[in-house]
């Protein structure tokens, strides 16, 4: 149905409530997300953009980083994943310490301030029978030679995997990795934090509560995390709002408890199905992300997460640089990283590419009439690449 004038008025009232930094209820968030009127969506877009401006200003940030997926050998079989391989299967790989070191060295030569380190769950990845020892060695391989780098690594799923392999608590794993030099965790493996969805797309992964528990423990132990949502597959609008609500509650709890760290950003990861396993690909019915849907979710995320998670980032790997740049008008304030390489999404059939230069990111930002700023992983500004162009 087409929303009536009264309902359009309600849309604006709710968006204005979010702009006033008053938290939306799940019911209110769902009402916004289910808007089916172009005029209503323009209101939501405008308010998302205004809230972005209020919380973080006009400057668009980016980070110079390198993504290292150290292995695609994985014991799990997620129904959306085209990256994983069994050991010995065609296309399987496992980087050596030397290869990881050389990739890091190359990244530093290109000005990287961050290495993002993630991989498949490989039961053979052990040193002297210990999974934790292997992961500690990964951290030390990088931080031992490049202590200035921020090491952003290991999702909650990887933390659970290490703990399960070695019979340790999550806290013990997190503390050992932090002591070795790990600086923060990516909030990947969240997918959708609703177990009905997880049973369909990733039945072997940790459940929603475990993901949230590990994120909270990371914060408690002083390790910042990001947060993500993979949308555009089998989830419902209600489940998108539930996911956002659980992220917001997790952040509120970490801040209320006075933990030394918290969630630094929210990233939408639209589903890419071109090379995904056939069952889910057929069920979803399209191979590439729906840009309009992604933009709408990003605007809703900005309004719903409000003052609690203020940095919002689109995925240029999934949406392409043009799509990601458009997201800067829908509540986003960051364009992410240069990456230098990326395998997980690319192997799923994404068309956005695997590497962008800082200049390409800067030019995309300039095209919006907003200034750019190079940042660190934790959103501290780096003065080397500050652009003070006039705003439109």
UniProtKB/Swiss-Prot annotation:
Residues 60-307 form the Radical SAM core domain. Binds 1 [4Fe-4S] cluster. The cluster is coordinated with 3 cysteines and an exchangeable S-adenosyl-L-methionine. Consists of two subunits, CofG and CofH. Pfam families: CofH_C (PF19288), Radical_SAM (PF04055). The keyword Metal-binding applies. Its EC number is 2.5.1.147. Its cofactor is [4Fe-4S] cluster. Belongs to the radical SAM superfamily. CofH family. Pathway: Cofactor biosynthesis; coenzyme F0 biosynthesis. [4Fe-4S] cluster binds at residues 74, 78, 81. It comes from Synechocystis sp. (strain ATCC 27184 / PCC 6803 / Kazusa). Disulfide bonds: none annotated. It catalyses: 5-amino-6-(D-ribitylamino)uracil + L-tyrosine + S-adenosyl-L-methionine = 5-amino-5-(4-hydroxybenzyl)-6-(D-ribitylimino)-5,6-dihydrouracil + 2-iminoacetate + 5'-deoxyadenosine + L-methionine + H(+). One of its GO terms (molecular function) is iron ion binding. Signal peptide: none annotated. It is an enzyme of class 2 (transferase). Keywords: 4Fe-4S, Iron, Iron-sulfur, Metal-binding, S-adenosyl-L-methionine, Transferase. Catalyzes the radical-mediated synthesis of 5-amino-5-(4-hydroxybenzyl)-6-(D-ribitylimino)-5,6-dihydrouracil from 5-amino-6-(D-ribitylamino)uracil and L-tyrosine. This is 5-amino-6-(D-ribitylamino)uracil--L-tyrosine 4-hydroxyphenyl transferase.
């Amino acid at each position: 149905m087409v929303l009536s004038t009264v309902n359009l008025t309600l849309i604006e009232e709710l968006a204005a409530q979010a702009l006033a930094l008053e938290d939306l209820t799940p019911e209110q968030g769902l009402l916004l997300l289910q808007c089916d009127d172009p005029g209503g969506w323009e209101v939501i877009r405008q308010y998302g953009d205004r809230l972005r401006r209020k919380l973080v200003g006009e400057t668009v940030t980016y980070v110079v980083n390198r993504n290292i997926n150290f292995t695609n050998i994985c014991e799990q079989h997620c129904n959306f994943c085209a990256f994983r391989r069994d050991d010995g299967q065609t296309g399987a790989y496992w980087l050596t310490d030397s290869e990881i070191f050389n990739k890091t060295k190359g990244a530093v030569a290109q000005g990287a301030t961050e290495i993002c380190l993630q991989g498949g769950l490989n039961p053979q990845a052990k040193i002297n029978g210990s999974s934790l020892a292997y992961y500690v060695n990964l951290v030390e391989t990088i931080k031992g030679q490049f202590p200035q780098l921020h090491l952003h690594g290991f999702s909650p799923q990887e933390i659970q995997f290490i703990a399960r392999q070695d019979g340790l608590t999550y806290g013990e794993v997190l503390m050992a990795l932090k002591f070795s030099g790990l600086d923060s965790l990516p909030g990947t493996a969240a997918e959708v934090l609703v177990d009905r969805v997880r049973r369909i797309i990733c039945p072997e992964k940790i459940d929603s509560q475990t993901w949230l528990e590990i994120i909270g423990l990371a914060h408690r132990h002083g390790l910042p995390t990001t947060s993500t949502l993979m949308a555009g597959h089998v989830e419902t609008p209600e489940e998108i709002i539930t996911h956002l609500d659980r992220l917001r509650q997790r952040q509120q709890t970490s801040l209320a408890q006075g933990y030394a760290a918290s969630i630094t950003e929210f990233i939408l990861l639209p589903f890419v199905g071109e090379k995904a396993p056939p069952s889910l690909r057929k069920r979803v019915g399209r191979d590439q992300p729906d840009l309009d849907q992604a933009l709408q979710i990003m605007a809703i995320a900005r309004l719903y997460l409000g003052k609690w998670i203020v940095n919002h980032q689109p995925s240029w790997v999934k949406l392409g640089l043009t799509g990601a740049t458009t997201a800067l008008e829908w509540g986003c304030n960051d364009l992410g990283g240069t990456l230098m390489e990326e395998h997980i999404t690319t192997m799923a059939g994404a068309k956005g590419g695997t590497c962008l230069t800082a200049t390409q990111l800067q030019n995309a930002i300039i095209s919006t009439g907003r200034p750019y700023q190079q940042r660190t992983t934790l959103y501290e500004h780096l003065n080397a690449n500050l652009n003070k162009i006039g705003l439109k």
